[in-house]
Regions:
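Flexible glycine-/small-residue-rich
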Residues: 22-29, 110-114, 141, 161-163
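Extracytoplasmic
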Residues: 15-22, 50-53, 58, 103-105, ...
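Extracytoplasmic beta-strand/coil segments of soluble accessory domains associated
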Residues: 37-48, 52-56, 66, 70-128, ...
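Non-catalytic regulatory/gating segments with a bias toward low-complexity or hydrophobic composition
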Residues: 55, 63, 74-75, 137-142, ...
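Outer-membrane beta-barrel translocator/receptor signature
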Residues: 133-135, 141, 145-198
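C-terminal segment of classical bacterial N-terminal signal peptides
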Residues: 1-5
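Short, acidic, small-residue-rich periplasmic hinge/interaction motif at the N-terminus
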Residues: 6-64
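Short, solvent-exposed loop/turn elements at domain surfaces
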Residues: 30-36, 118-119, 181-182
Length: 198
């Protein structure tokens, strides 16, 4: 038994150790207003130029520049979308047969057909999105997937929410004032709580 243990120890020493190169995943690949990749259409990270679907990606820079804070203000600037309400570009509603009556959810049409399915991280939601917690918005006009998926005939509007960034301290404060007494305040803070851990 001693001979076998000694032989195993020699075999372990003979094995060379391979050190792998660091592997990193970047959250967002965009340059200004131009997004380079998406999960929409295939559920696999794909370059936008290689997708066979009509997809628009609204980047954080574009959201900031147009002053968008909700779906209505984003869809007013998007391709092949219509939104009802004060900032809208169509009158009337679309009867979808469901019980939802929230205009922030139902007051939009994509491709002139019907409201798009709203998703957060590509999971269905009825929660309207807001710019304070949004990193990018992907509008997929038409069927949502290559093989399967959840979508209305109009398509999918996906909201990608902000996530905590480990190992980084940053923050921002925004104040916005508008006509007729409108105002909005935002506070966004990311900080290290326990150095090296959280």
């Amino acid at each position: 038994a001693v001979f076998i243990q000694a032989q195993e120890a020699e075999d372990e020493e003979d094995e060379s150790i391979f050190e792998l190169s660091p592997f990193s995943i970047q959250e967002d690949e965009s340059i200004g207003y131009q997004a380079l990749s998406t999960l929409a259409g295939t559920r696999i990270k794909t370059a936008l130029r290689d997708t066979g679907a009509a997809i628009s990606v609204i980047t954080p820079e574009f959201l900031e520049d147009i002053g968008a804070v909700d779906a209505a203000s984003v869809l007013s600037y998007s391709l092949n979308t219509e939104v009802s309400g004060e900032q809208g570009n169509f009158a009337g509603g679309v009867e979808t047969g469901d019980d939802r009556s929230n205009p922030a959810v139902n007051g939009q049409r994509v491709r002139g057909i019907s409201p798009a399915s709203l998703t957060r991280g590509y999971f269905l939601t009825d929660i309207p999105f807001d710019s304070y917690n949004t990193t990018r918005i992907t509008i997929n006009r038409g069927p949502n997937s290559l093989l399967f998926g959840v979508a209305n005939p109009g398509g999918v509007i996906n909201n990608q929410v902000k996530l905590a960034t480990l190992g980084d301290n940053f923050g921002s404060v925004k104040f916005r004032f508008g006509e007729r007494g409108g105002n909005r305040q935002e506070l966004d803070v990311n900080g290290i709580i326990i150095p090296g851990r959280l």
